């Protein structure tokens, strides 16, 4: 099993799909990495040589991925909340921040419905 950026890549998957197991790498970026390394998208992870895996690691090192990306995203949201802007306020309240209606819908962001008894108290 290949290990890239601290993630075990499933060996039975194609290179393009297997690389998407890494947080921060989607299909488009995976294709660009494969192109830069000269690897066919359809080549299975288990068929890659150690040299191929090393090339992939070098390419991936150029991007912000996994823990660093998660930390950066969290810090960006925290910054919005600290400066007190509208988007930060919506994040703090757990509401949608891109203008969607909230009188009805927005259940994913707001969580499960509160019963009528809970509202009357």
From Swiss-Prot:
Superkingdom of the source species: Bacteria
Keyword presence, tRNA-binding: yes
A single BP term in Gene Ontology: translation
Pfam family for this entry, one: Ribosomal_S13
Any one GO cellular component localisation term in the record: small ribosomal subunit
GO molecular function: rRNA binding; structural constituent of ribosome; tRNA binding
Disulphides: none
Residue ranges of the region described as Disordered: 93-121
Keywords: Ribonucleoprotein, Ribosomal protein, RNA-binding, rRNA-binding, tRNA-binding
UniProt xrefs under NCBIfam families: uS13_bact
Family note: Belongs to the universal ribosomal protein uS13 family.
Subunit structure: Part of the 30S ribosomal subunit. Forms a loose heterodimer with protein S19. Forms two bridges to the 50S subunit in the 70S ribosome.
Described function: Located at the top of the head of the 30S subunit, it contacts several helices of the 16S rRNA. In the 70S ribosome it contacts the 23S rRNA (bridge B1a) and protein L5 of the 50S subunit (bridge B1b), connecting the 2 subunits; these bridges are implicated in subunit movement. Contacts the tRNAs in the A and P-sites.
HAMAP family (UniProt xref): Ribosomal_uS13 (MF_01315)
Protein name (Swiss-Prot/TrEMBL): Small ribosomal subunit protein uS13
Organism: Paracidovorax citrulli (strain AAC00-1)
Gene: rpsM
């Amino acid at each position: 099993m290949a290990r890239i950026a601290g993630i075990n890549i499933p060996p039975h998957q194609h290179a393009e799909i297997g690389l998407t197991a890494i947080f921060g790498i989607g299909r488009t970026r995976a294709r660009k990495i494969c192109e830069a390394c000269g690897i066919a998208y359809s080549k299975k992870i288990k068929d890659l040589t150690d040299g191929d895996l090393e090339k992939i690691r070098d390419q991936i090192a150029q991007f912000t991925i996994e823990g660093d990306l998660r930390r950066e995203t969290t810090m960006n949201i925290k910054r919005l909340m600290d400066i007190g802007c509208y988007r930060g306020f919506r994040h703090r309240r757990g509401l949608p921040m891109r203008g969607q209606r909230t009188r009805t819908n927005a259940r994913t962001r707001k969580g499960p419905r509160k019963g009528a008894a809970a509202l009357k108290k």
